[in-house]
Every structure is written in C-alpha cells, then in structure tokens.
C-alpha cells in the first residue's frame, strides 16, 4: 500500500463524525443521509445490496451494522479503458466528427462524457455479435455433421486441431472479459461516498492492482485512483476512486438545479399572470390541466434530493471507469 493510501486511511480514522446536514450548501452528506441514499439505490436497483458481513472490528459505529457498505458483484468489463478514446485521441482521427465527439470538462475538472454510454453499448453489442458468430460456426458444423450422417456420405468428423482452433477463438474472447465487485462506503474525511473496485479475470482469479488500473481512464490513474486495502474486508486489495472532488461536483450540480428551479418559478409566475386574464370557463380548463402536472412540478421544484445522491454519484464516476458496466441509473431520475 502506498504512502498516500496510508495517509488516507489515517485521515479517515482521525476525522470526527459530523451528523449535521449541509447537503444543499456544500454537496456533502451525513452518515444518516448516506444510509437514506443507499436505501433508495437498493430500492431502485436490486443489483446493489447493503453488505451485512463486515467484520466487527472493521465496522463503523456511526452506521447500522447491516448497512456498513453497498455492493454489486460480478459487473462485466468487456474492454480495457485504453480502448475508449478520449476527446484528445479522437481529434484528427475523424475531423468531421471532432466537434460532436468532444468531451466537456466542468469547472471542477471532472469529465462530462457525451458519448461514453454509446461507446459502452456499441462495445457490448460488438462482443455479443462476436459470440453469436462463433455460435453460428458451431451450429454450422453440427448441421453439416448431421446431414453427412443422414445422407450416409461418410463418418467424417472434425479433426482435434480444428476444435483446438475454435477453443482458441473462444479463449481469446473470454480473456478480455473481466468482472468487478464494486463497493461504496462512507468517507468520514470528505463526507461523501467512496468507491472501491475488486477485479477478477475470466477464470475468476483476482486481478493484480496494475491490472485493475487498466480499466481506469488514464486521465484519472494518477489523480483519483489509488491502491488500498478494502476497508470492509480483511486481506483484500482494491483500487479506490478518491472522493476529493465529489462534493465539489455535487455543488456545481446543485447550482444548476437552483437555476432550473428559478426558471421554473418565473415560468409559473408568468402562467399565473396569464390565468388572471382568462374567462371563468377557460380558468376551469386550465386548472384541470395544471392539476394533472402538479406532481411533476413539485418534483422539479425540489431540485436534487439527497436520496438521489448515489444515483448521481454513479453517473459522474462512470467517466473514470468507462468499460465497467455498472451504471444502470440512466432512467432513474
């Protein structure tokens, strides 16, 4: 474990717990809000679960024993992060698409990827197509064998070498597949969630730290990703995503949310002025229409809710690990 990781662990241990809620002003959350956001994530996406097997000597007293961390297991990664070109790499490769493919960087330095989910979907489809092609070859061989047997053309069978060639094709495809267990814990020093990755190869053998780094965007390897012992288990090496920027990013999102809320209020005020000019019958019709959309308006006026924190957290953390397909949260909000 590096010096940076040791200092980070020490800081986590020494930082006092703050139970006050200041999510709206700072983008940070309290332990109670972390549990609330975790409950919402588990409710919306059952692939995430609260971990209840944390050793007692590693448990944090300010969290419930059965809600020490969140975990989702066996999440696939079909390609390494280097296969996902950044905006810098794409420039010049196809000049006509440079403007469309550029990635926006927010004022805190985090990347807002426009195309990242499309790339992941395309890659996943590509892997599926490759698998289908191989299955088609197997079906083709089986069908030919049956036809030859029924037609009594002969007992010709594929040589062992030919089967070996097919095994090599399958092995090559499977060797690219990795699976990750993802853990979300509460960081006392930064008062935000913290993500840990534990990876395995296609045979279920644990990945070395440097191998896990291959699934992390090169822009973040030296900035936000570090090798640490998993804090909720013994003798488990992981790669953590440093949470130093998380609250800052959330503050930016909160700012945008407030701006949207202000625009919504101005729109409602304008609508009220228009209603005052309507006739009685027109007002009745308009009131019925407003009642139908009332729930949606109330939701928008609330802006970003604290129980949505982990949903948003997973969205902007996806730019760090572009190939790991754990962001199932696109339609949650």
From Swiss-Prot:
Residues 84-174 are annotated as: Flexible region. Residues 95-108 have a biased composition (Acidic residues). One of its GO terms (cellular component) is cytosol. Residues 278-290 have a biased composition (Basic and acidic residues). Residues 248-308 are annotated as: Handle region. InterPro entries: Atg3/Atg10. It comes from the Eukaryota. It is found in: Cytoplasm. It holds the Pfam family Autophagy_act_C. One of its GO terms (molecular function) is Atg8-family ligase activity. Keywords: Autophagy, Cytoplasm, Protein transport, Transport, Ubl conjugation pathway. Residues 81-112, 278-300 are annotated as: Disordered. The active site is at 244 (glycyl thioester intermediate). GO terms for biological process: autophagosome assembly; autophagy of mitochondrion; cytoplasm to vacuole targeting by the Cvt pathway; glycophagy; nucleophagy; piecemeal microautophagy of the nucleus; protein targeting to membrane. The keyword Protein transport applies. Monomer. Interacts with ATG8 through an intermediate thioester bond through the C-terminal Gly of ATG8. Also interacts with the 40 amino acid C-terminal region of the E1-like ATG7 enzyme. Also interacts with the ATG12-ATG5 conjugate. The N-terminal region is involved in phosphatidylethanolamine-binding and is required for ATG8-PE conjugation. E2 conjugating enzyme required for the cytoplasm to vacuole transport (Cvt) and autophagy. Required for selective autophagic degradation of the nucleus (nucleophagy) as well as for mitophagy which contributes to regulate mitochondrial quantity and quality by eliminating the mitochondria to a basal level to fulfill cellular energy requirements and preventing excess ROS production. Responsible for the E2-like covalent binding of phosphatidylethanolamine to the C-terminal Gly of ATG8. Belongs to the ATG3 family. This is Autophagy-related protein 3. The gene is ATG3.
């Amino acid at each position: 474990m590096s010096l940076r990781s040791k200092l980070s662990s020490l800081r986590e241990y020494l930082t006092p717990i703050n139970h006050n809620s200041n999510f709206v002003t700072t983008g940070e959350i309290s332990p109670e809000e972390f549990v609330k956001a975790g409950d919402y994530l588990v409710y919306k996406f059952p692939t995430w679960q609260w971990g209840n097997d944390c050793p007692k000597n590693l448990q944090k007293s300010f969290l419930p024993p059965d809600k020490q961390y969140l975990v989702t297991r066996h999440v696939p990664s079909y390609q390494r992060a280097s296969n996902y070109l950044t905006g810098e790499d794409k420039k010049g490769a196809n000049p006509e698409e440079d403007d469309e493919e550029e990635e926006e960087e927010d004022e805190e330095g985090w990347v807002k990827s426009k195309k990242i989910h499309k790339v992941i979907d395309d890659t996943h489809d590509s892997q599926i197509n490759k698998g289908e092609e191989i299955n088609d070859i197997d079906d083709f061989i089986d069908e030919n064998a049956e036809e030859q047997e029924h037609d009594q053309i002969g007992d010709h069978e594929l040589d062992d070498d030919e089967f070996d060639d097919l095994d090599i094709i399958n092995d090559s495809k499977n060797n690219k597949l990795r699976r990750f267990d993802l853990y979300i814990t509460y960081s006392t020093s930064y008062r935000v969630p913290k993500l840990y990755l534990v990876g395995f190869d296609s045979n279920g053998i644990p990945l070395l730290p440097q191998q896990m780094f291959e699934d992390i965007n090169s822009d973040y390897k030296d900035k936000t990703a570090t090798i640490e012992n998993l804090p909720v288990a013994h003798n488990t090496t992981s790669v953590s995503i440093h949470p130093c920027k998380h609250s800052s990013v959330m503050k930016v999102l909160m700012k945008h949310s407030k701006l949207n809320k202000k625009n919504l209020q101005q729109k409602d005020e304008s609508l009220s002025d228009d209603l005052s000019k309507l006739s009685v019958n027109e007002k009745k019709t308009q009131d019925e229409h407003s009642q139908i959309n009332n729930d949606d308006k109330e939701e928008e006026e609330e802006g970003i809710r604290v129980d949505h924190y982990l949903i948003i957290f997973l969205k902007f953390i996806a730019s760090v690990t572009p190939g790991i397909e754990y962001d199932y949260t696109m339609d949650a909000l």
